């Protein structure tokens, strides 16, 4: 068993990026479990480009139901069913999202049964693992031995449940992964209790993501050295030297943590 976690940025782009794949990370825990965080419509292509076939995944965790975070799930479901002989991987879903993920997003393309079979459900394609959530703070779920995730509610868009993720490996708070959130001082305080922080950013203030200026103004220079920026626009290179001690997470790069 390895004693390190590896995180590969499959995609680092914003929802409207044409230069980068949808923001997504492939995390390999020290026990060997490979967890994909979010699976937007361009993520299966991004995995292929990096040499990770879909059958190399053990599970997928969904943080919210925007298309750039779930749009590739239909492809994964159908590929596992028809190409991989019905293989089912874990689908880790916050308990507040399980129903809407199927009824409002995936059912339209996956509801059609085989001849003579009943109409399928989400559990016919994935091993659905409902994750605990809390409206007011952190919720902890043990996934396997020496492996756990924590969910933190975020404010992203009105009336949509969304979550940041804390990754715990061998009892160590390794990575805080913001997914999508507006600037939130309290959330950043939680984030900085982890060894490493991967935080979404945009290059203007206002809107539905934390801005680079807001992050720079709040996070100390010492802590900035532990922060990687992700979910950015195609003009990222214009800001490459304007991020203080923070670094931009690079698409295709594997980080040993």
Curated annotation (Swiss-Prot):
Beta-lactamase-like as annotated region, ranges: 21-231
Pfam families, per the entry: Anti-Pycsar_Apyc1
Tree of life domain: Viruses
Positions of transmembrane segments: none
Cofactor note text: Coordinates 2 Zn(2+) ions. One protomer coordinates the metal ions and the opposing protomer provides the catalytic residues required for cCMP hydrolysis.
Purpose: Counteracts the host Pycsar antiviral defense system. Phosphodiesterase that enables metal-dependent hydrolysis of host cyclic nucleotide Pycsar defense signals such as cCMP and cUMP.
Name under which the protein is recorded: Anti-Pycsar protein Apyc1
Organism encoding this protein: Bacillus phage 010DV004
Gene this protein is translated from: 152
């Amino acid at each position: 068993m390895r004693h390190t976690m590896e995180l590969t940025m499959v995609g680092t782009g914003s929802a409207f990026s044409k230069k980068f794949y949808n923001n997504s990370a492939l995390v390999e825990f020290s026990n060997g479990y490979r967890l994909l965080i979010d699976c937007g419509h361009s993520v299966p292509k991004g995995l292929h480009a990096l040499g990770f076939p879909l059958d190399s995944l053990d599970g997928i965790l969904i943080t919210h139901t925007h298309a750039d975070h779930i749009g590739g799930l239909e492809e994964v479901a159908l590929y596992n069913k028809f190409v991989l002989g019905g293989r089912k991987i874990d689908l880790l879903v916050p308990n507040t999202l399980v129903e809407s993920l199927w009824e409002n997003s995936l059912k339209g393309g996956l509801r059609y049964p085989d001849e003579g079979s009943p109409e399928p459900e989400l559990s016919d394609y994935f091993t659905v693992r409902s994750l605990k959530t809390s409206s007011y703070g952190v919720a902890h779920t043990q996934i396997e031995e020496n492996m756990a995730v924590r969910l933190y509610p975020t404010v992203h868009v009105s009336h949509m449940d969304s979550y940041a993720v804390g990754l715990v490996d061998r009892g160590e708070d390794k990575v805080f992964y913001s997914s999508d959130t507006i600037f939130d001082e309290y959330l950043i305080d939680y984030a900085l209790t982890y060894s490493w922080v991967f935080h979404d950013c945009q290059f203007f203030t206002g809107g539905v993501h934390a801005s680079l200026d807001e992050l720079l103004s709040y996070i100390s220079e010492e802590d900035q050295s532990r922060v990687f920026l992700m979910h950015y626009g195609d003009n990222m290179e214009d800001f490459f030297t304007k991020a203080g001690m923070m670094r931009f997470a690079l698409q295709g790069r594997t980080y040993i943590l």
